[in-house]
Amino acid sequence: MVRFIFVTGGVVSSLGKGLTAASLAMLLQAKGFKVCVRKLDPYLNVDPGTMNPHEHGEVYVTDDGAETDLDLGHYERFTGVSSCKFDSITTGAIYSKLLKDERLGNYTGVTVQIIPHVTNIIKDFILSNTKGFDFIICEIGGTVGDIEGLPFFEAIRQIGNKLKNENCLFIHLTLLPYVKTARELKTKPTQHSVKELRAIGITPNILVCRAERNISKSEIDKIALFCNIESEYVIPAIDQKNIYLVPIAYHNSGLDNKVLKFFNINVVPSKLDKWYDIIGRLKDSSSKVRIAIIAKYHKLKDAYKSVIEALDHAGIYYKYKIDLVWINAENLTEENINKKLLNIDGILVPGGFGERATKGKITAITYARTNNIPFFGICFGMQLATIEIAQNLIGIKDAVTEEFKVDGTKIIEKINKNCEGSKITIENVKKTMRLGSYPCSLVANTIAANAYKSLEINERHRHRYKFNNEFQNIFEKNGVVFSGFSKDEEIVEIIELPELRWFVGVQFHPEFKSKPFEAHPLFIQFIKAAIEYTLRK
C-alpha cells in the first residue's frame, strides 16, 4: 500500500521545503522505493504560466505540457523521474474545477462550501494516480497560518486521520534563527509554529530545523520537549554551500532511516554512489569558467533557476566552478559592452517574452559572434540570434519578430495564426503556446548531432513563435546551419554557425532535462567550448 508524506513549513517562507521533499524522495529511491513528489500551491492563479517572474520565478514545464512551480524542477533533478500534470495543483485550479462543476449542476443543488467540497478536491488530487508508487510526498506551499493555505492543511489533516500513522507521516520544516548578540539559536519561533500546526489538528511526526550553524543536543532536546516530539525525530538541516550537498546531509542526519522506522519498514542500505561522486567532483572543482547570462530579470535569479542548475551540472561534469556574471540586458549598449563582458568565457541568452531588453540581448549576440566567444541562445535567445544574423550578417536591417507588432521583415512568425486579431485573453494565450515535450530530428555531422550522439531527440518547449522558413535558403547561403527540425519539418529547432568556436541556438528548453548526475549534452558542449576558450586566452 502506498504511504503518504506531507511536507509543511513554518516561521518563514523559502526555507527549502522543495529541496527537503526532493532530497527525501531521492534518499528513499536510493533504498529501492518508487517515489512520486507533488506540489500543492495555495495561490489563486490556475497555474504560474501567466505570472510575472518577479512574482513567482521560473515556470517549469513538464513533458506533458504542464506549467508548474520551479520546485518540480528540484524533484526531477534529484530523482531523475519526470513529473507530470498530476503532480501540481493550485487553489486557482481547484476553484476553477469547483465552479465549473457547480454551474453544470454536479453538486445537485447543495450549498457548495470549503468543507467538504474544496477539501474533497484536494484529497482526490492527493489520493489519485498513486499506482506503482511506494511513497507519495506532497509539499504544501506557503507557511502554516497562511489564510490561503487552510483548506490544504484541513485536507491533509483529514487524510492523516483516515490513514493513521501506518500510512501517513507529517514533516514540518522550521527555522532556528541565530541571534549574534546572544550567540544562540532561538527555538521559540519553532515552538509557536508547531503550536499553530497542532491547533489545526496536525501533529508533526518529524521536525526538520533549518539553521546556519550546528544544533547542539541540548537545543534538540529542548525543541523535542516543547514540541512534544521524540528527540531522534528532530532533524538538523544545516546550511550547505551547494544544494547537491543537501541529500547527503539529510542522510547523515538519519532522515531517511527515521522515515522507514516510523512506518515500521526494515532499514535497508542506500545506493548513493552517484551522489558521493557529485560531492567529490564539487570538492575537486578548483578552476573557474565565467559565463555571462544576458538577462531581463537579472536581480531575480529564480527566474532562470533551471538554466543556472544546468550550467552547474556541466561544471560538475568537468570539475569546474561556474562563475555566473549577471548582465542587465536593458543597460547593455555598444558603448559599454567591452567593459561589461571583459574576461567572459561564454555568453548565454535565456528564454523570455516581450520587447523590453531585447536591444541589449541582440548587442550581446553581436559581440559573441564577432569576437568568436562561445554563445548559447535558448528559445527567445535563439529567435534573437536569427534576428541579429539577419540584421548584421545577411543585411536585412529591418528584421524583426512578429511578437513585437512593429513594421519590418518578419524573421520570426507565429506558430498558430488562428487567434490572430482576436482579443488577447488567458484562454487563447494558452491555445497558441507550444508546450511540453516534442520530438526533434537532427541533421548528421552537426554540432547538435555530435553532442546528442543521436539523430532523434525529445525536448521540452514553451513558445508561440518560430523561425520563418521562407528565409532558410538565404540564411544557409550565409553560413547558418539548421541542424534540428520538428518531425513535420515546419519548426526550426536548432541553428548553428559552425565556422565559429561554438555558436548554437535552440528553440526548446534543454535546461529542463538536465540532472546533476546526467548533465545535458548541449550544456556539456557549451561549457567545454568555454573552458577551451579560457585556456587559449
Curated annotation (Swiss-Prot):
The keyword NAD does not apply. Its EC number is 6.3.4.2. Keywords: ATP-binding, Glutamine amidotransferase, Ligase, Magnesium, Metal-binding, Nucleotide-binding, Pyrimidine biosynthesis. UTP binds at S13, K186, T187, K188, P189, T190, Q191, K222. InterPro entries: Class_I_gatase-like (IPR029062), CTP_synthase (IPR004468), CTP_synthase_N (IPR017456), GATASE (IPR017926), GATase1_CTP_Synthase (IPR033828), P-loop_NTPase (IPR027417). Residues 1-265 are annotated as: Amidoligase domain. It holds the Pfam family GATase. One of its GO terms (biological process) is pyrimidine nucleobase biosynthetic process. PROSITE patterns: GATASE_TYPE_1. Belongs to the CTP synthase family. CTPSs have evolved a hybrid strategy for distinguishing between UTP and CTP. The overlapping regions of the product feedback inhibitory and substrate sites recognize a common feature in both compounds, the triphosphate moiety. To differentiate isosteric substrate and product pyrimidine rings, an additional pocket far from the expected kinase/ligase catalytic site, specifically recognizes the cytosine and ribose portions of the product inhibitor. This is CTP synthase. It comes from Rickettsia felis (strain ATCC VR-1525 / URRWXCal2).
